[in-house]
Structures are given as C-alpha cells and as structure tokens.
Amino acid sequence: MVVAASTCRTETVFDYSWMNVVVAYWNRYPNPSSTHVLTEDTIQREVRDGKLFSRRLLSKTNPVPKWGARFYNNVPVKIVEDSVLDPVKKTFTTFTRNLGMTKIMKVDEIVVYSEQKDGSTLAVRRAYISSQVFGFSRAIRAFGIERFKANGNKASNGFNYVLRRMFPDSLVGGGHHQHAVTTTSPAGELPATTITVSTTNGSLNNQGALKSAAKVGYEFFKSHASKIAQLFSVKN
C-alpha cells in the first residue's frame, strides 16, 4: 500500500556554541514552552567509534481540533528518540517517531545540529507526516504540518530559555540571528538546488513530475542513508 506523506523543513540558528547547545539539549525539559512534554527517560546510551548513541522515551500530549476528536482521544503518545553525537565533526543528529496512533498520523522527524563558521549552531529539522485514515488523510497531514511548525516554534523558544539560563554570558555570532526559514511540500521535499516539481492539491500533476519527485526522494534518502542507519543501529 502506498501511503502519501507531507514534509516540512525548518531551520533555526541558536546564538550559542555547538557544545553549549548539546549540553542544553539534555537539560531542556521542563521549560515554560514544553508543557506538552510529560515525561522523558533515557533507556540506553553507549559510546561506539568515538560517537555517543542514545535512545530516549518521551510521552507527549497535544490538544486536537473538534473534527479530530473522533480519531484521537487526547491520551499521551509515546515518542522514541534515537540520537548520535559526533564530537569530531561537531554534529548532533536526532531521529524521533511516534509509537502510538501511527495509522491516524505518523510523524518521523530528523534534526541535525551543526556548528557554523561564526560559532553559532544551526538546527535543520525535517518532518515526514503520513496518515492512513481513508478520506481524511489530507486534512490530517495538513493539521500535522501546522502542528509541527507550531511545536517547532515552542521548542526553539523553550530551548533558548534553557540556553539563557544555563549560559547567560555565552552568546556568539553577535546574537542577531532570526528564526525564519520554513519550507513545506505536500508530496515530498523538493530541494530547490535539485529539481522543482509543480503540485496541485497535494498531487503531482503528471507522470514526468512523478518520476522527478521519485528521483528527488531517492537522492535525499540516499544522501542521508548513513545517518539513518546509524540511528537505527542502536540496539533494542
């Protein structure tokens, strides 16, 4: 069965060093912007090949619109988070996915934190949202995209709150960065540097466009295969 997926990509620059961001990441809950995060537990952690592999289990809750109440009764949802910290390349990659309600809405998210030339830290978030609810898939995916963007803003605000408290005198890059870049695609992420494919109501408009989109998706996942393989290699 082919399941349609919507994607969203956001970029956030934190005016703190990569090391400070990584340290704060493990201490970012609780904060005033994360009341929807109920629990977090580290269930596995190990060092392999000089990299830190971690697996955490979180529970979160979010209110849904009235039309969504028929599918989701607002019970907490378990989230598993795998991460890889590479101190040599100064990258920190997280991969999260929900364990419950996956037929209603499945959200796979990859975030890469990397050091910038001016000493700040760039976080690139990519989410892939799918739904198997017949007749409501498009509406649920659209809701998921908007919720992802809203939660991303909350996460950035909460993260900055923790960074300010932990490292009050450690701003880098002049403290002038803005959180501004967001791109979405109902049919798949289409990097502007590769191919542009026009879409209509979330569907690719012709067979040639479909082939182009498939090529884009293949190239993207091929380029990230090693990271995804590393994340999944954390043993259960």
From Swiss-Prot:
GO biological process: dendrite morphogenesis; mitochondrion organization; phospholipid transport
Disrupted gene: phenotype observed: Lethal at early larval stages.
PROSITE patterns linked: PRELI_MSF1
GO cellular component: mitochondrial crista; mitochondrial intermembrane space; mitochondrion
A GO MF term: phosphatidic acid transfer activity
Domain PRELI/MSF1: 5-171
Subcellular localization: Mitochondrion
Keywords linked to the UniProt accession: Mitochondrion
Tissue localization of expression: Widely expressed.
Function: Involved in maintaining the structural and functional integrity of mitochondria. Activity is required for maintaining the subcellular distribution, shape and activity of mitochondria in neurons and as a consequence has an important role in the development and maintenance of dendritic arbors. Function may be particularly important in class IV dendritic arborization (da) neurons.
Protein's name according to its UniProt entry: Protein preli-like
Organism ancestry: Eukaryota, Metazoa, Ecdysozoa, Arthropoda, Hexapoda
The gene coding this protein: prel
